[in-house]
């Protein structure tokens, strides 16, 4: 039920986010998608000609810069790494304000000319919705992480009308796990979000293309070569993206809230020169697949998109890198296909098929998500005939990417912040204190307790061990059921003692501020079930391995021993 609700809200959120982008683009440019009419003057300000695009990123930056800096700094950038971090290191906890700030900031950035995608933001928005809902009903952490992944899957499904790709994206990139127990909830959310989006936006393929066929075996060799090139281009995109971001960090010395507006002037000049870079750029992508642009123009647009997206992120913009990687791949594939058709007319086939395969291959090279890459292009186009070329090129692109770079476009951002998701997670036991797990109401035995009374108390004790204290509640030692049972059996023929003083074991203790890991190490060394927690030599509670196991089972904690 929760997965269904997350999917429905994410689907509705994706619709609203898309409309918000279109509305703001209309305000800033006079048209719903300026990339469809690049270079046209603003219909409400015709006197400015095409120069108005220099100002739109500046105005947008003045609006979303303070919003991000003051409202939710984690809304800056492309969003997916923040969701990955929340799932892997924060138990799925994402502040509710992120959904609101990310929606407004990304819509302003894209509507104002930012050359980024809307998929990354909607993933973060959907994940924040899932996290907020899960925390509201107090689900355990394992379920909370799943609800975050449900939101991510719903975001991709609703944005692209691609429910299969949404599921795999959530499991391959967000959860980084294909466990069967996760699959059902993610599928429900993805399907629900897609149904909600289709009911409003319609059910049609993202790109309306003629059927492509691979008619010559030699064509597969060309697809393989394209995959190798795409893997290298994907890695190049990663390096340019973070290289420009580093450059902007070194150059900028002013307040962060002003950075998008000042940097927006540079972006505006770039848009003046290459208006096709305005916003997401899907119309340009579609035209490249259908063969509108010559090879030289395609390569120029590839370079321009790489720089425009990197600059948008570098100046503090908010938007995704999913769509730009598809755009770059389409330009590379279309240029490769047109060249192949000229050089090998009997082998190459349709140039458009290379553009589609290039989209998937560059995304795979950048994101290291080969299954998502294959499915996303398949669902975007509805073109099953290219499944084998897609699988071949994507596999090679992923392999080349691994050879050239350790990190993907998503994990690189986290590694630069000192977070390595591939490294073992910091142990929960090393970061939590005994105070959180001690039993302050544990029974203690007085030193003069009769043996029979001690036996009864130990019989009711969960760990069959109890601390023994003197009249000032200072710890004397620990009495175990084994020691008492030995005396009560009377096998050695000795007279039963009147009290327990002679049966008490002297043991090490822990303080409430000791780490859980240290306390567990002590239990392991002493082969004991529990240990007394003391403060100024007085017993304040009892810590046991049993309490740790109960806590882990209830919370399904990551990184536990």
Question: Where is each model-derived feature located?
Answer:
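Alpha-helical transmembrane segments and immediately membrane-proximal extracytoplasmic
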Residues: 1-431, 435-441, 445-476, 530, ...
